[in-house]
Amino acid sequence: MAVDHATDIRRTITGLVLAAIVVLALVLRGWVLLALILLVAALGLWEFFSLFWGNKRIPSRVCAIALGWGMLTLTWAHRTQDALVCLGAGFVLAAMSFLFRWNEVEEEGVPAFAASGIFMAGLAYIPLLLLPATYLSTTKLIFVLAAVAVSDTSAYFVGTRFGHHKLWPRVSPNKSSEGAVGSLVGCVIFCTIYGACLGRASWWAFALLGIAINAFAQLGDLFESALKRAVHVKDSSNLLPGHGGILDRADSILFAMPMFAVVDQWFFFF
Protein backbone atom coordinates (compact mmCIF):
# COMPACT_ATOMS: atom_id res chain seq x y z
CA MET A 1 0.00 0.00 0.00
CA ALA A 2 1.40 3.41 -0.96
CA VAL A 3 2.43 5.87 1.73
CA ASP A 4 0.75 9.29 1.55
CA HIS A 5 2.83 11.63 3.72
CA ALA A 6 0.30 14.47 3.50
CA THR A 7 -2.41 12.16 4.82
CA ASP A 8 -0.05 10.98 7.56
CA ILE A 9 0.51 14.58 8.66
CA ARG A 10 -3.20 15.42 8.68
CA ARG A 11 -3.96 12.19 10.50
CA THR A 12 -1.28 12.84 13.12
CA ILE A 13 -2.35 16.44 13.79
CA THR A 14 -6.01 15.47 14.08
CA GLY A 15 -5.09 12.55 16.34
CA LEU A 16 -3.07 14.80 18.66
CA VAL A 17 -5.92 17.32 18.92
CA LEU A 18 -8.41 14.55 19.68
CA ALA A 19 -6.06 13.04 22.26
CA ALA A 20 -5.68 16.42 23.98
CA ILE A 21 -9.46 16.87 24.16
CA VAL A 22 -9.97 13.37 25.57
CA VAL A 23 -7.18 13.74 28.14
CA LEU A 24 -8.60 17.09 29.30
CA ALA A 25 -12.06 15.55 29.68
CA LEU A 26 -10.64 12.59 31.60
CA VAL A 27 -8.73 14.89 33.95
CA LEU A 28 -11.74 17.12 34.64
CA ARG A 29 -14.31 14.28 34.50
CA GLY A 30 -17.78 15.19 35.81
CA TRP A 31 -19.93 17.21 33.45
CA VAL A 32 -17.03 17.82 31.07
CA LEU A 33 -16.54 14.11 30.38
CA LEU A 34 -20.29 13.57 30.11
CA ALA A 35 -20.58 16.44 27.62
CA LEU A 36 -17.85 14.89 25.45
CA ILE A 37 -19.58 11.49 25.56
CA LEU A 38 -22.91 13.07 24.61
CA LEU A 39 -21.26 14.93 21.73
CA VAL A 40 -19.68 11.73 20.40
CA ALA A 41 -23.02 9.94 20.69
CA ALA A 42 -24.91 12.68 18.84
CA LEU A 43 -22.39 12.96 16.01
CA GLY A 44 -22.07 9.19 15.75
CA LEU A 45 -25.83 8.70 15.54
CA TRP A 46 -26.13 11.44 12.92
CA GLU A 47 -23.43 9.82 10.79
CA PHE A 48 -24.94 6.36 11.22
CA PHE A 49 -28.38 7.47 10.07
CA SER A 50 -26.86 9.49 7.21
CA LEU A 51 -25.38 6.29 5.82
CA PHE A 52 -28.89 4.93 5.24
CA TRP A 53 -31.17 7.98 5.10
CA GLY A 54 -28.98 10.64 3.54
CA ASN A 55 -30.22 14.05 4.69
CA LYS A 56 -33.78 12.89 5.42
CA ARG A 57 -35.78 11.79 8.51
CA ILE A 58 -34.50 14.61 10.73
CA PRO A 59 -37.21 14.08 13.41
CA SER A 60 -36.19 10.43 13.76
CA ARG A 61 -32.55 11.43 14.22
CA VAL A 62 -33.40 14.03 16.87
CA CYS A 63 -35.56 11.50 18.70
CA ALA A 64 -32.77 8.91 18.65
CA ILE A 65 -30.23 11.44 19.92
CA ALA A 66 -32.57 12.47 22.76
CA LEU A 67 -33.08 8.83 23.78
CA GLY A 68 -29.35 8.14 23.52
CA TRP A 69 -28.57 11.15 25.67
CA GLY A 70 -31.11 9.92 28.21
CA MET A 71 -29.48 6.49 28.34
CA LEU A 72 -26.00 7.94 28.84
CA THR A 73 -26.96 10.65 31.34
CA LEU A 74 -29.02 8.29 33.50
CA THR A 75 -26.20 5.72 33.54
CA TRP A 76 -23.75 8.47 34.49
CA ALA A 77 -26.14 9.36 37.35
CA HIS A 78 -26.11 5.70 38.51
CA ARG A 79 -29.68 5.06 37.35
CA THR A 80 -28.96 2.22 34.96
CA GLN A 81 -32.43 0.68 35.21
CA ASP A 82 -33.99 3.98 34.13
CA ALA A 83 -31.47 4.19 31.29
CA LEU A 84 -32.72 0.89 29.91
CA VAL A 85 -36.23 2.36 29.83
CA CYS A 86 -34.96 4.81 27.19
CA LEU A 87 -33.88 1.88 25.03
CA GLY A 88 -37.29 0.29 25.52
CA ALA A 89 -38.97 3.58 24.64
CA GLY A 90 -36.96 3.63 21.43
CA PHE A 91 -38.30 0.22 20.50
CA VAL A 92 -41.89 1.32 21.23
CA LEU A 93 -41.46 4.39 19.02
CA ALA A 94 -39.91 2.32 16.24
CA ALA A 95 -42.74 -0.22 16.54
CA MET A 96 -45.38 2.54 16.37
CA SER A 97 -43.70 4.00 13.29
CA PHE A 98 -43.81 0.59 11.63
CA LEU A 99 -47.40 -0.07 12.75
CA PHE A 100 -48.77 3.04 11.10
CA ARG A 101 -46.59 2.80 7.98
CA TRP A 102 -46.03 -0.93 7.56
CA ASN A 103 -47.31 -1.06 3.97
CA GLU A 104 -45.51 2.07 2.81
CA VAL A 105 -42.33 2.22 0.78
CA GLU A 106 -40.37 5.43 1.13
CA GLU A 107 -38.79 7.41 -1.68
CA GLU A 108 -35.49 5.55 -1.35
CA GLY A 109 -37.32 2.23 -1.69
CA VAL A 110 -36.78 1.38 1.99
CA PRO A 111 -39.76 -0.39 3.63
CA ALA A 112 -41.08 1.03 6.90
CA PHE A 113 -39.90 -2.07 8.77
CA ALA A 114 -36.32 -1.51 7.59
CA ALA A 115 -36.45 2.14 8.66
CA SER A 116 -37.63 1.11 12.14
CA GLY A 117 -34.82 -1.45 12.30
CA ILE A 118 -32.23 1.17 11.36
CA PHE A 119 -33.56 3.43 14.14
CA MET A 120 -33.14 0.69 16.77
CA ALA A 121 -29.79 -0.43 15.37
CA GLY A 122 -28.47 3.11 15.81
CA LEU A 123 -29.53 3.19 19.47
CA ALA A 124 -27.98 -0.21 20.16
CA TYR A 125 -24.80 0.49 18.19
CA ILE A 126 -23.76 3.86 19.58
CA PRO A 127 -25.26 5.08 22.90
CA LEU A 128 -25.72 1.57 24.30
CA LEU A 129 -22.13 0.57 23.55
CA LEU A 130 -20.89 3.92 24.90
CA LEU A 131 -22.45 3.35 28.35
CA PRO A 132 -19.21 2.04 29.97
CA ALA A 133 -17.55 5.40 29.25
CA THR A 134 -19.90 6.97 31.82
CA TYR A 135 -18.82 4.79 34.76
CA LEU A 136 -15.35 3.32 34.16
CA SER A 137 -12.59 4.90 36.26
CA THR A 138 -10.06 7.27 34.71
CA THR A 139 -7.32 4.62 34.85
CA LYS A 140 -9.52 2.08 33.07
CA LEU A 141 -10.74 4.55 30.46
CA ILE A 142 -7.21 5.69 29.66
CA PHE A 143 -6.16 2.04 29.38
CA VAL A 144 -8.86 0.91 26.96
CA LEU A 145 -8.80 4.11 24.88
CA ALA A 146 -5.01 4.02 24.59
CA ALA A 147 -5.03 0.29 23.78
CA VAL A 148 -7.46 0.88 20.93
CA ALA A 149 -5.50 3.92 19.74
CA VAL A 150 -2.29 1.87 19.68
CA SER A 151 -4.13 -0.89 17.80
CA ASP A 152 -5.45 1.51 15.16
CA THR A 153 -2.17 3.39 14.80
CA SER A 154 -0.11 0.19 14.52
CA ALA A 155 -2.52 -1.21 11.93
CA TYR A 156 -2.36 1.98 9.87
CA PHE A 157 1.40 2.47 9.80
CA VAL A 158 2.30 -1.22 9.43
CA GLY A 159 -0.38 -1.70 6.79
CA THR A 160 0.58 1.34 4.72
CA ARG A 161 4.25 0.39 4.69
CA PHE A 162 4.30 -3.40 4.65
CA GLY A 163 0.78 -4.44 3.69
CA HIS A 164 0.67 -6.73 0.64
CA HIS A 165 -2.00 -9.32 1.52
CA LYS A 166 -5.65 -8.27 1.72
CA LEU A 167 -7.33 -9.10 5.02
CA TRP A 168 -10.96 -9.17 3.83
CA PRO A 169 -11.33 -7.52 0.41
CA ARG A 170 -15.13 -7.79 0.25
CA VAL A 171 -15.50 -5.84 3.50
CA SER A 172 -12.51 -3.49 3.49
CA PRO A 173 -10.22 -3.60 0.44
CA ASN A 174 -7.60 -1.32 2.03
CA LYS A 175 -6.98 -3.41 5.16
CA SER A 176 -4.10 -5.86 5.06
CA SER A 177 -3.18 -8.97 7.01
CA GLU A 178 0.15 -7.35 7.88
CA GLY A 179 -1.69 -4.38 9.35
CA ALA A 180 -3.89 -6.69 11.42
CA VAL A 181 -0.84 -8.49 12.81
CA GLY A 182 0.89 -5.19 13.55
CA SER A 183 -2.24 -4.02 15.35
CA LEU A 184 -2.29 -7.15 17.50
CA VAL A 185 1.40 -6.97 18.39
CA GLY A 186 1.24 -3.27 19.24
CA CYS A 187 -1.83 -3.71 21.43
CA VAL A 188 -0.42 -6.69 23.34
CA ILE A 189 2.88 -4.89 24.02
CA PHE A 190 1.06 -1.78 25.24
CA CYS A 191 -1.35 -3.71 27.48
CA THR A 192 1.47 -5.76 28.99
CA ILE A 193 3.54 -2.67 29.85
CA TYR A 194 0.53 -0.70 31.14
CA GLY A 195 -0.57 -3.64 33.28
CA ALA A 196 2.92 -4.19 34.69
CA CYS A 197 3.07 -0.55 35.76
CA LEU A 198 -0.48 0.13 36.99
CA GLY A 199 -2.38 -3.15 37.07
CA ARG A 200 -3.19 -5.67 39.78
CA ALA A 201 -3.14 -8.77 37.58
CA SER A 202 -0.06 -10.54 36.19
CA TRP A 203 1.63 -9.42 32.99
CA TRP A 204 0.44 -12.48 31.07
CA ALA A 205 -3.16 -11.73 32.08
CA PHE A 206 -2.77 -8.27 30.56
CA ALA A 207 -1.21 -9.83 27.46
CA LEU A 208 -4.30 -12.02 27.06
CA LEU A 209 -6.49 -8.98 27.69
CA GLY A 210 -4.59 -7.18 24.94
CA ILE A 211 -5.41 -9.99 22.52
CA ALA A 212 -9.11 -9.75 23.43
CA ILE A 213 -9.21 -5.95 23.17
CA ASN A 214 -7.48 -6.05 19.81
CA ALA A 215 -9.81 -8.75 18.49
CA PHE A 216 -12.91 -6.75 19.41
CA ALA A 217 -11.34 -3.51 18.16
CA GLN A 218 -10.65 -5.06 14.76
CA LEU A 219 -14.16 -6.55 14.65
CA GLY A 220 -15.61 -3.11 15.37
CA ASP A 221 -13.50 -1.60 12.60
CA LEU A 222 -14.56 -4.30 10.14
CA PHE A 223 -18.22 -3.96 11.11
CA GLU A 224 -18.21 -0.24 10.35
CA SER A 225 -16.33 -0.92 7.11
CA ALA A 226 -19.06 -3.38 6.15
CA LEU A 227 -21.73 -0.75 6.83
CA LYS A 228 -19.96 1.74 4.57
CA ARG A 229 -19.36 -0.92 1.94
CA ALA A 230 -23.07 -1.77 1.95
CA VAL A 231 -24.04 1.82 1.15
CA HIS A 232 -21.02 2.51 -1.12
CA VAL A 233 -19.28 5.27 0.85
CA LYS A 234 -15.62 5.57 1.86
CA ASP A 235 -16.00 7.45 5.17
CA SER A 236 -18.90 8.05 7.54
CA SER A 237 -18.25 11.79 7.09
CA ASN A 238 -15.34 14.20 6.51
CA LEU A 239 -15.51 15.80 9.96
CA LEU A 240 -12.01 14.72 11.07
CA PRO A 241 -9.19 15.44 8.57
CA GLY A 242 -7.20 12.30 7.85
CA HIS A 243 -9.60 10.10 9.80
CA GLY A 244 -13.03 10.53 8.20
CA GLY A 245 -15.93 10.81 10.61
CA ILE A 246 -16.64 10.18 14.27
CA LEU A 247 -17.70 6.61 13.52
CA ASP A 248 -14.47 6.02 11.61
CA ARG A 249 -12.59 7.05 14.75
CA ALA A 250 -14.83 5.40 17.36
CA ASP A 251 -15.77 2.14 15.61
CA SER A 252 -13.09 0.09 17.37
CA ILE A 253 -13.80 1.65 20.76
CA LEU A 254 -17.51 0.88 20.51
CA PHE A 255 -16.75 -2.86 20.41
CA ALA A 256 -13.66 -3.03 22.64
CA MET A 257 -14.81 -0.90 25.58
CA PRO A 258 -17.96 -2.90 26.51
CA MET A 259 -15.97 -6.15 26.28
CA PHE A 260 -13.33 -4.75 28.63
CA ALA A 261 -15.99 -3.45 31.04
CA VAL A 262 -17.56 -6.92 31.28
CA VAL A 263 -14.24 -8.76 31.67
CA ASP A 264 -13.02 -6.30 34.31
CA GLN A 265 -16.08 -7.03 36.45
CA TRP A 266 -14.89 -10.62 36.81
CA PHE A 267 -11.10 -10.48 36.82
CA PHE A 268 -10.25 -7.12 38.48
CA PHE A 269 -7.35 -6.01 36.32
CA PHE A 270 -7.05 -2.68 38.16
Feature map (PLM): residue ranges:
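Membrane-embedded alpha-helical segments of transport systems
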Residues: 154, 181, 247-255
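Hydrophobic alpha-helical transmembrane segments of membrane transport and translocation systems
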Residues: 254, 258, 262-263
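Interfacial loop-to-transmembrane junctions
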Residues: 230-253
